[in-house]
UniProtKB/Swiss-Prot annotation:
May be beta-lysylated on the epsilon-amino group of Lys-34 by the combined action of EpmA and EpmB, and then hydroxylated on the C5 position of the same residue by EpmC (if this protein is present). Lysylation is critical for the stimulatory effect of EF-P on peptide-bond formation. The lysylation moiety may extend toward the peptidyltransferase center and stabilize the terminal 3-CCA end of the tRNA. Hydroxylation of the C5 position on Lys-34 may allow additional potential stabilizing hydrogen-bond interactions with the P-tRNA. It is found in: Cytoplasm. One of its GO terms (molecular function) is translation elongation factor activity. Keywords: Cytoplasm, Elongation factor, Hydroxylation, Protein biosynthesis. It comes from Actinobacillus succinogenes (strain ATCC 55618 / DSM 22257 / CCUG 43843 / 130Z). SUPFAM superfamilies: Nucleic acid-binding proteins, Translation proteins SH3-like domain. Belongs to the elongation factor P family. This is Elongation factor P. The keyword Calcium does not apply. PANTHER family: ELONGATION FACTOR P, ELONGATION FACTOR P (EF-P) FAMILY PROTEIN. Pfam families: EFP (PF01132), EFP_N (PF08207), Elong-fact-P_C (PF09285). The gene is efp. Pathway: Protein biosynthesis; polypeptide chain elongation.
Length: 188
């Protein structure tokens, strides 16, 4: 099995920690004035979803995680599972609510998602970075009401709620950044 040393660490690297695949969110090399250098990392366990801060002594090796990222198209959802299909082989994968997590509110039919597989089953789903959704409910923007933050909540077609500018009306299609859940622009 492949392994990585602390010099290979970078955000997005997947490795095994305590028998569970993990991904590095951020890392920093630290050389204190006294003592041995180390790498300070923030990792997310891919199965449990826990975020941990872990320090590794410089030169420490970790085992590479045997995970695979696939670009799959979202097909449909039933009572318990979300189904994704490989665009070339038409092979279907089913992911449970734990694997889909927060991505549920950004999933559109035929949206290309990154599905992470471990031992052949999906453990996480990453939606596209940007999605275009219709506003189904929002308060009317009052003319001249610009004293506040200049935003209002809007419910989108998938059920997600985001803050939008006052000029956005019901029925308009907007572009949303799924990583931060923020409004980006109006779609013409």
């Amino acid at each position: 099995m492949a392994s990585y040393t602390t010099t290979d660490f970078k955000p997005g690297l997947k490795f095994m920690q305590d028998g569970e695949p993990c991904v590095i969110i951020e890392n920093e090399f630290v050389k204190p004035g006294k003592g041995q250098a180390f790498t300070r990392t923030r990792i997310r366990k891919l199965i449990s979803g826990k975020v941990l801060d872990v320090n590794f002594k410089s030169g420490t090796s970790v085992e590479a995680a045997d995970v695979m990222d696939l670009n799959l198209n979202y097909s449909y959802k039933d009572e318990a599972f979300w189904y994704f299909m490989h665009p070339e082989t038409f092979e279907q994968y089913s992911a449970d609510a734990k694997a889909v997590g927060e991505a549920e509110k950004w999933l559109l039919d035929q949206a290309e998602c990154i599905v992470t597989l471990w031992n052949g089953s999906p453990i996480s789903v990453t939606p596209p970075n940007f999605v275009e959704l219709e506003v189904v409910d929002t308060d009317p923007g009052l003319k001249g009401d610009t004293a506040g933050t200049g935003g209002k909540p809007a419910t989108l077609s998938t059920g997600a709620v985001v803050r939008v500018p006052l000029f956005i009306q019901i029925g308009e299609v907007i572009k949303v950044d799924t990583r931060s859940g923020e409004y980006v622009s109006r779609v013409k």
